[in-house]
Each structure stands twice: as structure tokens, then as C-alpha cells.
Amino acid sequence: MAEKFIKHTGLVVPLDAANVDTDAIIPKQFLQKVTRTGFGAHLFNDWRFLDEKGQQPNPDFVLNFPQYQGASILLARENFGCGSSREHAPWALTDYGFKVVIAPSFADIFYGNSFNNQLLPVKLSDAEVDELFALVKANPGIHFDVDLEAQEVKAGEKTYRFTIDAFRRHCMMNGLDSIGLTLQHDDAIAAYEAKQPAFMR
């Protein structure tokens, strides 16, 4: 089973860029592995580092700013996760330490992949995201409270409502990925298989 997500309080980092694609999130040269770990080191590699080997941090990239070290909530702009389909993108984000991405919109495939990997994509309106960017930039180091059960983000003195469909919310709150969902029906699967002719087993 995956880790349950019910509530999360975390440091927020503002990535003020629209149409951040999956190749920017995790460049293609790092996709050889099929395990989910180790990708965080290469998250936003071409933006975070000045060299190809990832040894010289770019001091002008927001994830490298001292006040945002340890951030677990990413604040982004519209169409986050667009581009080619690669599940490595949410792998890289979660391996780096992100639990939540807040944006006005997400690419459809990235949105679905995020739930499969216990990364919560929160959609808020453009105006609400503008407010949050202003709040974070005025208060570096601010933390947000994200409550999946209540479907709320508490930021400063305001509360922002978001909506996640009931099935995805149930899965995240119970730590159920595709394997976990299947195992919930293990007895029924075993009973079905037992009824099959021997040559089909």
C-alpha cells in the first residue's frame, strides 16, 4: 500500500512559470531507470543546475534559494505537467519531497499520474493562484495547510476550497494505488480463479 494522504502542512515554493512540461520536470536523459527512486536528484535538472552533470547549482533558480529548502508544496501556473507522457515526472517530484502541487490547471495525463503516485494536484482558479503567489512572495518561508478530507487549503488568513473526485480522494486517503485496489478484491479474485477449468489456471 502507498502512504495515506489526509492532511499535509508544508513549506511552499513558488515556481512562477506556465506550461511547465514533463521534459523540464525530468529531462529525458534521466529516464532509463524503471524504479521510482532517485529521480529527485534530477528534478528540473536543466533549471536547477548550470552544468550537465548537476554539480553546479543555479543560484537564480527558485528551488535553490535558501528560504525554500525542504519545500513540500509546489505553487505553479497553468497547464503544469504538459508535454510527453512520462510517469517519471511525478516520481521526480515525490522523490524530491513534494506532496502537493497547486496550479490553475494540469495536463490530463500528468494529473492522473499524480494520484497514482500519492502526489496531490490541487486546482484553484487563476485569481486564487495569483493571490497565493503574492502571499508567498511577500512571506518567504510560509507554510500552507492542505486538508484532502475537507478539500481545503489554508494559507495565511484565508481558506481556499478545491474539489477532488470521490474515487481519487478515497484512494489517496487510504493509500491505495492500483495494486492496493486489486488486493482489496483478493478473495473474489481467488474465488473466480478457483471456478475456472484446470487448463485455464
UniProtKB/Swiss-Prot annotation:
The keyword Cell division does not apply. Pathway: Amino-acid biosynthesis; L-leucine biosynthesis; L-leucine from 3-methyl-2-oxobutanoate: step 2/4. The keyword Amino-acid biosynthesis applies. Catalyzes the isomerization between 2-isopropylmalate and 3-isopropylmalate, via the formation of 2-isopropylmaleate. Its EC number is 4.2.1.33. Keywords: Amino-acid biosynthesis, Branched-chain amino acid biosynthesis, Leucine biosynthesis, Lyase. PANTHER family: 3-ISOPROPYLMALATE DEHYDRATASE SMALL SUBUNIT, 3-ISOPROPYLMALATE DEHYDRATASE SMALL SUBUNIT 2-RELATED-RELATED. Belongs to the LeuD family. LeuD type 1 subfamily. One of its GO terms (biological process) is L-leucine biosynthetic process. It catalyses: (2R,3S)-3-isopropylmalate = (2S)-2-isopropylmalate. Heterodimer of LeuC and LeuD. One of its GO terms (cellular component) is 3-isopropylmalate dehydratase complex. InterPro entries: 3-IsopropMal_deHydase_ssu (IPR004431), Aconitase/3IPM_dehydase_swvl (IPR015928), AconitaseA/IPMdHydase_ssu_swvl (IPR000573), IPMI_Swivel (IPR033940), LeuD (IPR050075). This is 3-isopropylmalate dehydratase small subunit. GO terms for molecular function: 3-isopropylmalate dehydratase activity. Pfam families: Aconitase_C. It is an enzyme of class 4 (lyase). It comes from the Bacteria.
